[in-house]
């Protein structure tokens, strides 16, 4: 018997409704097997650099060129490998993370560039069908995924994949590309401007021109032409190669620099392939540097459309930027700013609980650096003054940021070393303090005693079991410049979170839906006493409190978040899937007022709506033209779907 499949609207995984002629001609639909559904909202992701994490096999350190290795030079390979990661799986299990995102393990260029840099990071690929010799071999990779999938670990592996480009076009290997060791082409040889393997349009000179951003070289990296059928097949087959080796999800590098129609087609084909081998629910999330709920115009304004319709979620850089400004205490950025962003992202992202939220990453200085330094340049787009705080104070602020990251709507990603408060104050060649490569330092250690480690473990465990944290509603309960108290809720599962970046303060909070009682905080030593839906809460500076209730006696909400899913929603060009029903929120059976939903994992479409409590609902799935409501109409057959909003959080229909 098939398990019922469900992604809520809060999913940012979407697929094209209007694919271009080439992509339509290539689409195939796989037969649906018995499969196990994967919902990544239950996951806590840990992002690590393979080369920087742990050296488990010193024999591969030099690779094919000893000049590429120097354990004391962060521009070069420093020794980390797959064997080292295998050896440290017990550590990661104890940390409570459930998914490991690794930098691309594919074969990279074998030489240093003119500035002495190497491909240790994995983003200068030359062969998408081989593992780089510095990291081990395919047997090592399969051993890693087999162990991760075993009952001892029950972890997922996220592959960082770079379909936008290969390697530099003007030095080193000049864009050379191979398939399992067989040479295909390089940038100088393949000179057809827009019909060959590469675009030959030069580098991006106008970052406000979206065509350039997508079709010119990103700096000097050879820009792949994904509309070429051979290129598409190479990238698709490369993805399947890694899925066959055990990959569970893909982080798409530089999604901003590729056409949406390619992303839609590729993610759809990979999703179908994953289903065909019995692994439904393959997850994608992309790197769009500058993606933010606050940015709705210009090139970066397109990020919201990609998040809602491309087939891939995004890393929420807007959340990261807002959180850093609030924690550092930059002028005008308060807990009210953070609360406003959390509310806004629910309105612009169709699927905000599927976007990936994070505090640290590899492209700008770590939060610990920004908190402690008085510099003004920390990385691309991050030219604001640091906090000049003490190490101890900075660590408390990092703890606060971790609690926020782990409890807001979205899938949390923790950058390696954050659990040890990693920070670096070295300036790179661009004058950026603590940025590339100094935010990619060797793993500082593997002890398990820090408060940050404890927070990640505790809240990671909470995420595994709590529907409220996985996909529940977000409601602000109390906020001022320094304190934010909010509720996450799904049915009778309620989590209350309080964050204080200011001086010690006592506040009175009302509208707390949990039953009367005393609730110990899941982190720290505080507790919350609730009586008649109110509490008086004392918070120390930089303190966080997290409580949970699962009582059937919880105060009934005035609204319920209901997740609608329509399965088997195959569409033609210009057609989308809608939900329609007997209540005003569903259009009152008026096709012109039906609610358009998102293709969460095509051909599955989902939406999340807030409806009044104790409401009897009848509804159906319907396909119709996006601009002409009476064209291309196809109704779900059979009886209406029915439910009462007090009785369920999920409801499903199918064509």
Curated annotation (Swiss-Prot):
GO terms for molecular function: cyclomaltodextrin glucanotransferase activity; metal ion binding; starch binding. The keyword Cytoplasm does not apply. Residues 630-655 are annotated as: Disordered. Its EC number is 2.4.1.19. Substrate binds at residues 123-124, 165, 217-220, 251, 256-257, 362, 436, 440. InterPro entries: A-amylase/branching_C, A-amylase_C, Carb-bd-like_fold, CBM20, Glyco_hydro_13_cat_dom, Glyco_hydro_b, Glycoside_hydrolase_SF, Ig-like_fold. The record marks 363 as: Transition state stabilizer. Its cofactor is Ca(2+). Residues 554-655 form the CBM20 domain. It holds the Pfam family Alpha-amylase. Binds 2 calcium ions per subunit. CDD domains: AmyAc_AmyMalt_CGTase_like, CBM20_alpha_MTH. Ca(2+) 1 binds at residues 55, 60-61, 79, 81. Ca(2+) 2 binds at residues 164, 223, 257. Keywords: Calcium, Glycosyltransferase, Metal-binding, Signal, Transferase. It catalyses: Cyclizes part of a (1->4)-alpha-D-glucan chain by formation of a (1->4)-alpha-D-glucosidic bond. One of its GO terms (biological process) is carbohydrate metabolic process. Residues 1-30 form the signal peptide. The active site is at residues 253, 287. Monomer. May consist of two protein domains: the one in the N-terminal side cleaves the alpha-1,4-glucosidic bond in starch, and the other in the C-terminal side catalyzes other activities, including the reconstitution of an alpha-1,4-glucosidic linkage for cyclizing the maltooligosaccharide produced. Belongs to the glycosyl hydrolase 13 family. This is Cyclomaltodextrin glucanotransferase. It comes from Klebsiella oxytoca. The gene is cgt.
């Amino acid at each position: 018997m098939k398990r019922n499949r469900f992604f809520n609207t809060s999913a940012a995984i979407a697929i094209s409704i209007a694919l271009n002629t080439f992509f339509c001609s290539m689409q195939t639909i796989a037969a649906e097997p018995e499969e196990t559904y994967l919902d990544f909202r239950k996951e806590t992701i840990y992002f690590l650099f393979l080369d920087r994490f742990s050296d488990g096999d010193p024999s591969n350190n030099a690779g094919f060129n000893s000049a590429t290795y120097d354990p004391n030079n962060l521009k070069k390979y420093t020794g980390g490998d797959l064997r080292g990661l295998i050896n440290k799986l017990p550590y990661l299990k104890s940390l409570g993370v459930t998914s490991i995102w690794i930098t691309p393990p594919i074969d990279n260029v074998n030489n240093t560039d003119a500035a002495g840099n190497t491909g240790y990071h994995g983003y200068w690929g030359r062969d998408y069908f081989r593992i780089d010799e510095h990291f081990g071999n395919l047997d090592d990779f399969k051993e890693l995924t087999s162990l991760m999938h075993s009952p001892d670990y029950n972890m997922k592996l996220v592959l960082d994949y770079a379909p936008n480009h290969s390697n530099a076009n003007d030095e080193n290997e000049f864009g050379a590309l191979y398939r399992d060791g067989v040479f295909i082409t390089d940038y100088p040889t393949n000179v057809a401007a827009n019909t060959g393997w590469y675009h030959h349009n030069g580098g991006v000179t106008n970052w406000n021109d979206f065509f350039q951003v997508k079709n010119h070289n990103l700096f000097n990296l050879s820009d792949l032409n994904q509309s070429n059928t051979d290129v598409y097949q190479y990238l698709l087959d490369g993805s399947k190669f890694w899925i066959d080796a055990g990959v569970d999800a893909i982080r798409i590098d530089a999604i901003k620099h590729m056409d949406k129609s390619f992303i839609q087609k590729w993610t759809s084909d990979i999703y179908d392939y994953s289903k065909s081998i019995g692994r439904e629910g393959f997850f994608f999330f992309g790197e769009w540097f500058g993606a933010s709920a606050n940015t709705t115009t210009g090139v970066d304004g397109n990020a919201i459309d990609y998040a809602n319709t491309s087939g891939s979620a995004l890393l929420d850089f807007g959340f990261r930027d807002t959180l850093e400004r609030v924690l550092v205490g930059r002028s005008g950025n308060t807990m009210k700013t953070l609360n406003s962003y959390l509310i806004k992202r629910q309105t612009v992202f169709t699927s905000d609980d599927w976007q990936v939220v994070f505090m640290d990453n590899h492209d700008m200085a770590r939060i610990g650096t920004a908190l402690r330094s008085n510099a003004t340049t920390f990385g691309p787009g991050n030219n604001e003054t640091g906090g000049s705080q003490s190490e101890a104070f900075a660590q408390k602020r990092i703890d606060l940021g971790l609690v926020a990251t782990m409890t807001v709507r979205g899938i949390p990603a923790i950058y390696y070393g954050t659990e040890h408060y990693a920070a670096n104050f070295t300036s790179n060649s661009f004058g950026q303090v603590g940025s590339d490569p100094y935010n990619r330092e060797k793993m500082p250690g593997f002890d398990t005693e820090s408060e940050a480690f404890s927070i990640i473990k505790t809240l990671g465990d909470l995420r595994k079991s709590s529907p409220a944290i996985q996909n529940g509603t977000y409601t602000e309960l109390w906020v001022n410049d320094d304190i934010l108290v909010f509720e996450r809720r799904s049915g009778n599962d309620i989590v209350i979170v309080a964050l204080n970046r200011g001086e010690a303060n006592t506040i009175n909070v009302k509208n707390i839906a949990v039953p009367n009682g005393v609730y110990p905080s899941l982190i720290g030593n505080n507790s919350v006493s609730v009586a008649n839906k109110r509490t008086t809460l004392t918070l120390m500076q930089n303190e966080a409190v997290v409580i949970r209730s699962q009582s059937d006696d919880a105060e009934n909400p005035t609204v319920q978040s209901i997740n609608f899913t329509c399965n088997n929603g195959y569409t033609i060009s210009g057609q989308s899937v809608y939900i329609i029903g007997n209540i005003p929120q569903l259009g009152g059976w008026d096709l012109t007022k039906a609610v358009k939903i998102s293709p969460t994992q095509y051909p599955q479409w989902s939406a999340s709506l807030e409806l009044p409590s104790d409401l009897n609902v009848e509804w159906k799935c319907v396909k119709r033209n996006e601009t002409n409501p009476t064209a291309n109409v196809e109704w779900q057959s059979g009886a209406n779907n029915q439910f009462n909003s007090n009785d369920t959080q999920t409801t499903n229909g199918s064509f």
